[in-house]
């Protein structure tokens, strides 16, 4: 996944920002063709989506010290977009109560069919899987604090709101 901060459509497509991107491309160690070849070598699926999400500062902070990522892409059932967003917020309350990182929520503006995606940043696979180390009592309390009846309700509730979803894990490519 590649994230390109835009700030706004007006600013992103302003002559100054277009000139900055052109200069950056000209100064790059890779030609546009070489960049696309490298991108293709690491990509199995490509789709463009424009989203609203956390601030650039929040994204940068989430990426600090991490190299393992969990991405969940969701298409809501008709009329369930708002409830899906709320469910994702509830899951964040649950995660934070367990001492885990909050996932970033990005909401579709244009492009791909997805209504939203979440991106969680972790140090490594063990960090991502660490919720299994939490006691059942603590998980139950965290679920209730987040608005769920139990931790076992979280996944099934999500599925009442979505037509489909994809999730995957990835590592940083540098």
Predicted regions and their residues:
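Short S/T/G/P-rich N-terminal loop/turn motif that feeds into the first structured element of a domain
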Residues: 1-174
């Amino acid at each position: 996944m590649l994230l390109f901060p835009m700030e706004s459509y007006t600013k992103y497509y302003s002559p100054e920002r277009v000139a900055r991107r052109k200069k950056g491309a000209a100064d790059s160690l890779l030609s546009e063709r070489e960049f696309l070849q490298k991108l293709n070598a690491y990509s199995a699926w490509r789709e463009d989506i424009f989203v609203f999400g956390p601030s650039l500062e929040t994204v940068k902070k989430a990426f600090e010290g991490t190299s393992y990522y969990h991405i969940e892409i969701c298409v809501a059932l008709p009329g369930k977009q708002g409830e899906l967003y709320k469910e994702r917020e509830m899951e964040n309350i649950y995660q934070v109560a367990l001492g885990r990182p909050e996932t970033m929520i990005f909401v579709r503006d244009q492009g791909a069919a997805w209504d939203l995606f979440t991106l969680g940043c972790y140090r490594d696979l063990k960090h991502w899987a660490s919720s299994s180390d939490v006691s059942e009592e603590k998980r139950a309390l965290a679920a209730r604090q987040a608005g769920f009846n139990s931790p076992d309700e979280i996944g099934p509730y999500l599925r009442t709101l979505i037509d489909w979803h994809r999730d995957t894990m990835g590592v940083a490519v540098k």
